[in-house]
Amino acid sequence: MNIIKTDIEGVLIIEPRLFRDSRGYFFESFSEREFEERISPILGHSVHFCQDNESMSSYGVMRGLHFQRPPYTQSKLVRCVKGRVLDVAVDIRKGSPTYGKHVAVELTEDNHVQFFIPKGFAHGFTVLSETAVFQYKCDNFYHPEADGGISILDDTLGIDWIIPTEHANLSEKDTKHAMLKDFDSPFDINVDLYK
């Protein structure tokens, strides 16, 4: 696999090694051994995934920007197995030199790219195709009482969602998240969330 570091430390784009022939293709979508040997040294710590999730959404659906508060913080490894999405990670760690900055990557059924989002980031995506099936691995279980978010429509984040926001389809919960300027982050750059 090819590991691409982004402008924000710890946020990684992962391109799997694809084997194609007349029958189709094959690739390892996840190998704990390879993740530990190749990615953990870049991150400076191990990540152990314990839950896999899948969602199906239609064009214009926007989900996010979500996170889980301590002590139930989550890292995520995400990919799109059908269709096309724009996936985004926003740094919400107080004191971080990249606080409020984001990384956006297009994930498609054809490019097979995966996106690693560390703890201390808000995560969201929008669907660019007619439908999309989205899968993600988490290193902590879902805890609804720790659910949090910031507004996916916050213009100050500078995210180009590609689709016009008037076509956005959001859950009621996601329409109620605070803008970044009104948000009191539970994360701090000086607190190691992996200990």
Q: How should these model regions be labeled?
A:
Residues M1-D110, T131, C138-K195:
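Non-catalytic, conserved peripheral segments adjacent to functional cores
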Residues L107-T131:
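Conserved metal-binding segment of the jelly-roll/cupin
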